[in-house]
């Protein structure tokens, strides 16, 4: 299992790298669960990280197909982009938007679709239905997150339900990632249900998700991740 830390700027990116994060994720927490950073800030994050770690970028929740394709194109040079489906509750538009993201992204950039455990409240497409959408779009993986940050993932979906979802993702040939107000205490459960990647922000910050990423906190989280089995993420997504 590997550790993704979401950062909102270059200073936080350097702290996450120094703390040992495996993936540096560009995201603006003030703009929601998948808030996209400005292009200049993404460029600054990429410069700060260099070749030290893969960088991912949140595209936000899907708008129209043209906007999604443009956002994916603007994130060229990252290892993967993450697309959410807040406000999208049926399969056909989800497929169209996911395909647009895949078309817009560079060929070397993987696509990760984001399902929300609290999909009824988001509202969004149910996580199990998003698996087929991901396969259709040529995505590399799926991330199960929470749209509203008022409860952690495993309080919304019990571990056995998450394990069933992860198994379906793996059966489709995709990797499974978990996020959603996770803490280090949740990592053992994430490993047990089969996730290849865990994503955090609040747990890595001093002052919660609106605070700043701490090198020491990232290092402490990485120590918990290192006990996990080796990742099976595709080599094209992470080195």
Each PLM stretch: what is its role?
Residues 28-59:
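Glycine/small-residue-rich interface belts in oligomeric ring/scaffold proteins
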Residues 39-48, 90-103, 200-239:
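C-terminal helical cap(s) of enzyme catalytic domains, especially alpha/beta-barrels
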Residues 16, 45, 142, 190, ...:
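Conserved, mostly hydrophobic/aromatic
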Residues 2-22:
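N-terminal basic/disordered segments at the start of proteins
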Residues 23-34, 76-90, 141-151, 193-218:
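Glycine-rich phosphate-binding active-site loops on the catalytic face of alpha/beta enzymes
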Residues 50-156, 164, 168-175, 185, ...:
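Conserved anion-binding
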């Amino acid at each position: 299992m590997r550790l993704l830390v979401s950062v909102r700027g270059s200073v936080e990116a350097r702290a996450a790298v120094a703390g040992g994060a495996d993936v540096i994720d560009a995201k603006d927490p003030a703009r929601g669960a998948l808030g996209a950073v400005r292009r200049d800030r993404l460029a600054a994050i990429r410069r700060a990280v260099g070749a030290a770690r893969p960088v991912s970028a949140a595209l936000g929740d899907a708008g129209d197909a043209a906007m999604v394709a443009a956002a994916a194109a603007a994130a060229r040079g990252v290892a993967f982009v993450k697309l959410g489906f807040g406000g999208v509750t049926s399969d056909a538009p989800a497929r169209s938007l996911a395909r647009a993201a895949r078309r817009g992204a560079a060929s070397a950039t993987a696509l990760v679709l984001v399902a929300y455990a609290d999909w009824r409240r988001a509202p969004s497409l149910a996580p199990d239905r998003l698996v087929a959408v991901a396969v259709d779009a040529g995505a590399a993986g799926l991330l199960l997150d929470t749209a509203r940050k008022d409860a952690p993932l495993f309080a919304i979906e019990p571990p056995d339900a998450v394990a069933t979802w992860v198994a379906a993702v793996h059966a489709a040939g995709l990797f499974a990632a978990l996020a959603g107000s996770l803490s280090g205490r949740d990592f053992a459960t994430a490993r047990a249900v089969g996730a290849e990647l865990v994503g955090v922000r609040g747990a890595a910050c001093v002052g919660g998700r609106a605070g700043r990423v701490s090198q020491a906190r990232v290092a402490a989280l990485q120590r918990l991740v290192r006990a996990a089995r080796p990742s099976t993420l595709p080599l094209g997504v992470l080195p």
